């Protein structure tokens, strides 16, 4: 029986009798500290996803607000908002040590890559075949027919390459965390996982 006024209960342990209650033993404290240390590398993926989610969401909102007269901008903005939502949803799953969260984040980055590539290809097509009035005016000033058009097209091509590198790296980073999460959940006592999941909302 715990002493009167002692409200600290020992979490259920895979190695301890279920009816036992009381403060954590030194052994359990050491076990919890070691588990928290091992979890830091995994939880870093959640912090990366937080940054990605809010950054992508900001661009999505701006695309929608600034592109109210453009169907392309609205579609891209809506796509970015979906990606941002999935990024934050995957972040929450990773914080609960759910391997499916890292898998979702990896696929989400591939989806973002596809969205960016599709937008850039569409923009290249429009630039080459239906150049805007601004591009035509610039070419009249520079005196080089097609020079600005091709420069803009090459700019979009560079964005495609950059997205393949950046989103490809992020996807690989997230997918690598799937095996780490699976290993962590297998090797960590159930009471520690339960405690960590219960406090997942407190993490930054």
Give residue spans per PLM region.
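Topology signature of small-to-medium multi-pass alpha-helical membrane proteins
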Residues: 2-204
């Amino acid at each position: 029986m715990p002493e009167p006024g002692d409200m600290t209960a020992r979490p259920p342990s895979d190695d301890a009798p279920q009816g036992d209650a009381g403060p954590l033993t030194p052994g359990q404290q050491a076990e919890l500290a070691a588990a928290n240390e091992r979890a830091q590398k995994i939880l870093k993926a959640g912090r990366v996803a937080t940054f990605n989610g809010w950054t992508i969401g900001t661009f999505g909102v701006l695309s929608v607000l600034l592109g109210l007269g453009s169907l392309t901008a609205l579609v891209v903005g809506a796509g970015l908002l979906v990606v941002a939502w999935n990024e934050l949803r995957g972040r929450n799953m990773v914080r609960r040590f759910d391997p499916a969260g890292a898998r979702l984040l990896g696929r989400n980055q591939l989806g973002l890559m596809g969205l960016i590539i599709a937008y850039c290809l569409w923009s290249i097509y429009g630039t080459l075949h239906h150049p805007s009035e601004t591009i035509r005016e610039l070419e009249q000033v520079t005196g080089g027919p097609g020079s600005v058009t091709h420069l803009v097209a090459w700019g979009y091509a560079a964005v495609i390459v950059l997205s393949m590198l950046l989103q490809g790296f992020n996807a690989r980073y997230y997918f690598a965390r799937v095996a780490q999460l699976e290993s962590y959940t297998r090797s960590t006592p159930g009471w520690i996982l339960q405690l960590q999941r219960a406090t997942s909302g407190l993490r930054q």
